[in-house]
Amino acid sequence: MSGGSTGERPFSDIITSVRYWIIHTITIPSLFVSGWLFISTGLAYDVFGTPRPNEYFTQDRQQVPLVNDRFSAKQELEDLTKGL
């Protein structure tokens, strides 16, 4: 079976075209800037529901929230999350 043409443009033709670079000189930096803003504004914490670095430990709870006994894990989790 010989290797036939699939009708697609060769990759070398794509990356040497002016249209490719006009499009990508806009999209690649804009993706970088939007990602940087997503992280630096703290929106990533809100979207994914993770606590901010200053919210891991409250004034009331300074210990690390670990579950020690797997058989009473539900009760331990309720005790740990009571103040949240």
UniProtKB/Swiss-Prot annotation:
Binding locations of heme: 24
CC cofactor: heme b
Membrane topology value: Single-pass membrane protein
Subcellular compartments: Plastid, Chloroplast thylakoid membrane
SUPFAM superfamilies registered for this protein in UniProt: Cytochrome b559 subunits
PANTHER family in the cross-refs: CYTOCHROME B559 SUBUNIT BETA-RELATED (PTHR33391:SF9)
Membership in a protein family: Belongs to the PsbE/PsbF family.
Protein name per the record: Cytochrome b559 subunit alpha
Record organism: Thalassiosira pseudonana (Marine diatom)
